[in-house]
Amino acid sequence: MAQEGVKWPKPLVRLNGVALIDRLIDVFLKNNATSISIIVNEEMTEVQDYLKALRLPIPFYLLVKSTPSSMHSFYELSHYLDGDKICLTTVDTIFKEEEFSGYIQQFIQEDKLDGLMAVTDFIDDEKPLYVETDNELYIRNFLDQADGDCRYISGGIYCLRRPALGVLNNAISQGMSRMRNYQRQLIAEGLRLKAYPFSKIIDVDHADDILKAESFLKS
């Protein structure tokens, strides 16, 4: 985004005057997170300084490490996760707060699930990951290309329970990378995953996404 004239590193990009990272932390606090862990790559020194100055009312872990993929970032963060319930996302994933609250509530209530994955039928992604579900929204597969039945794509928000971390360790030891391959591995190892539809989820990848995201949040 710097090449497109955006002056901030992505976590500090403002939407309606609020930095992406502040918005995300605030949403997690409002939904009763018991701790927050953030990984930042080594080049983002401005973001590191910004986060080091934060004071939160719950335990806050900041990990500075550059990794080859988002799955590796999750693996590095997983060492800081002590509870049974995890919600994972990236800083550029924009969603409606009230939908996120409903999502968290369903994950807590459906305690037999190994994972509840945010999905949307709003497709504005360069390389979407299609999510194949049954009639009850249990996930059958994750696909790079849509087949006839795929209504949803991955929204990039993941609620997971402890068994999913075992699969993560297996995926790393097998040399896998990328979150989409990890998600396929969750299915391959027989974990119970369900999809939770959001009306719309936007990724802030480019400068013109900032205005789109701002108007979406105001709508």
What are the language-model segments listed below?
Residues 14, 80, 132, 159-161, ...:
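Short, well-ordered beta-strand micro-motif
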Residues 12, 131-133, 195:
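A structural signal for short hydrophobic beta-strand segments in well-ordered beta-sheet cores
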Residues 6-9, 27-31, 38-43, 54-55, ...:
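A generic "structured core" feature
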